[in-house]
Amino acid sequence: MKTKKIVVGLFCSMIILMGCQPDQRTEKMKESTESEAVQVTSGTSAATNATSVKQEEQTNTNDQPKESAAKVSYERNGHTFEVDAVSGATVEANNGQSGISPEEKAQKMYWSGRPEIGEVQGDYYHHEVVFDGGYTALIDVVVKDQQIQLVEFDERGPKNYYSEEWAGVTKRLSGYANFQANNARTDQSLVTVVNTMTFLENQMVAENRLDGAFQTAKGQSNSANNGYLPAARALAKEIKEPSKEHYTSLTEDFGEGLSGRLTVITLKDSRKITDLRYDEYFADTEEEIKDAKLKAYSRQSKYFSKDYAQKSGENFKKEVDDLRKKAIEENKLVSPTNEEAWSENYQSLVKKITSQ
């Protein structure tokens, strides 16, 4: 009897141990996954720092808890936007039966990534975060008298992006949002990544903070939670201290569906130019763009558009890059080397900035 009891006891112990081992391995795998980090780079054009943030694992399961969304309105570039705002990550399911026609979808979707008309001045801060295996979140922040004047996000896709034509391309003004709008994935959310960018920017400026909880646009929140918000939080303490760089930008409406912005960044102590940016932006609707050949570039900019240079024949990006290089070398707002089509618009902004 004693021997029988020992054998039975050993058999039960083996069953218990065998039942425990898979759970232990799962827990170790979970701990290993949660300890992984993604690279984060930070700095202004004068200096670069490095930090790191944890990469949150995203799941897309039927039993994922649903977020309760609230309708929130905000204004940008003369348009009132209404988004389904949520806190936390959301995954927008699509069963291919949205019940929305392309015409109705085009009517309901609206985004505006171009800068607002006016002048912005203050201390300049910049940060970049690499997240989710190769995406890069970029943020510019301008602060004056302890008040946030500007928050501007962008995102660059990875080199191995599934759609080759968008690999390594920024999303805000390239036409990527148009690509999203034409994709069935947005049939239910009716928002693009640009909606999430501007929705966050509006909150941060209005509430004068970069950290803490923010709402995101339902259906486009993963980039915000994994990239944009970590990038903003990384600057939350830095913007409390004076920056070494000063930011000045002027944005004007040139008419006929075209606007432009000139940005000059200088070192405060020496007034040396560290960066010069110039871009021209097409209006948010084709109806506003008078030149029929340019209507296809609505909501894009000449500098960042994926297709503008090749299809228009105007090598705007190279011309501006050459101007930027010369301005930094000579430390002054130089004129374009040739009679570029955009020269007159650029010169008008230079005169107004230098006369201040």
Predicted regions and their residues:
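Active-site- and interface-proximal helix/loop "cap" or "latch" segments in soluble metabolic
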Residues: 67-121, 127-246, 253-261, 267-356
